């Protein structure tokens, strides 16, 4: 398929320009795209996606405009092509096309997404909007980080459905000879052809247990057949998934009987249709299934500077380094003890979809003179991130939670922790050494000194005395807690950080394709989220009055 070209010659009597020009606000996303679509998304920008032979494609500039409007309005593919065919604003946004300009089928949008995903610059539409914002001076040296749940596009499966779907997937992925061998070891009276739950009297506990055991034995028999074999990629992936499902949800009891485990695996797969989705918690009381969408914004212009999608169980602090990859110097910081207090395990890190691969300078000389300032709520107040920001000489505006004070007793910050001297001094002026551990932290045990201490009742109820855990990043956390006691710091934090909440609200206003993912798989969800960020930036351009000018290329209209 060869590159199609967007027509620039308009029909004087049938163009949408004369009709929409006085009706569509210049500051709307339709007005912005109408004025700047040929500059932002020229057909040549997508030339690498097409060949030199074949029939002409739908002009990619038109497709890009439709994709952007589809994301901002939360349309499905079919709804989007219908809007382009019948809504004059959409043709007006695509350069002022004629009313009778032909539409196209919805599969063109899916084809364009696939071409972009297979290219070296899958997020080029977002990159273009960010580059325009930089050239207009809208991207400074402040970054506010936050995340939001993205509900997956599939149903969460229970254990029985998971195991049976895993078996079905393996049988489907296996070649004819291997499938015949696998089916020969199946013990249940089930051909595993139809999807869904197997037939069972689910009101009968004994029948449920028998079903779980039978499914588990079938799964284990299949895995034994695969053990030690060289498999092609589909069969290998299906076998690994089945082994994961059995291991995470089942326990083998006395007599080799399998039962559902009374626990939740740390990285539990929740669906065989989208194996990358995970259980997540935005707060202790708010759980969800799917992914997390992370964004970084410039708080002064409210332009989104970076996006990232991770599994739902990934911590916010673990993703911050990827969000700030274009702003922080490259450095190697071990991703251990993410919480930094010695009590929490490291979060699972996901791959970022970086914001800028256009080849343009990401920071002007003026921007580089100012230190980077990073804002975030307490989810970003982790030691590993604080260390990275300190190493980059960044201004740390991420909130750090105060130490826990069980039962109203002395919190950790009442103790003087001297990591240099390797000692801890309690409020009663008793000093004990820190016993280091392999993770880089340690513990300080006061032991028998607490027995005769007059402050013991205010400090601990443990018979063995108070013990203080020292995390690897204790010094960074202590400095951050001290800094955020400054009233000026608090005023700046309260005035700046909430802006990212409003931006997330703008992105999530449409449930379809906003809060609810339209596609399956982390890579596709990330590409969709990046496109949503691009559409949100374009809408912001209209509010700011961004226009094309000579010289730097872009400027904000004077207010």
Give the positions of each predicted feature.
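Basic, low-complexity segments
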Residues: 1-53
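Alpha-helical support elements that line or immediately flank enzyme active sites
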Residues: 62-74
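Anion-binding and metal-coordination hotspots
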Residues: 79, 97-98, 102, 107-559
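Double-stranded DNA-binding cores of transcription factors and transposases
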Residues: 3, 60-61
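Alpha-helix boundary/capping segments in eukaryotic regulatory proteins
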Residues: 73-81
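A short glycine/serine-rich beta->alpha loop
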Residues: 49-56, 519-522
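Function-dense linear segments that define catalytic or interfacial modules
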Residues: 37-44, 73, 296-300
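DNA-recognition alpha helix
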Residues: 80-92
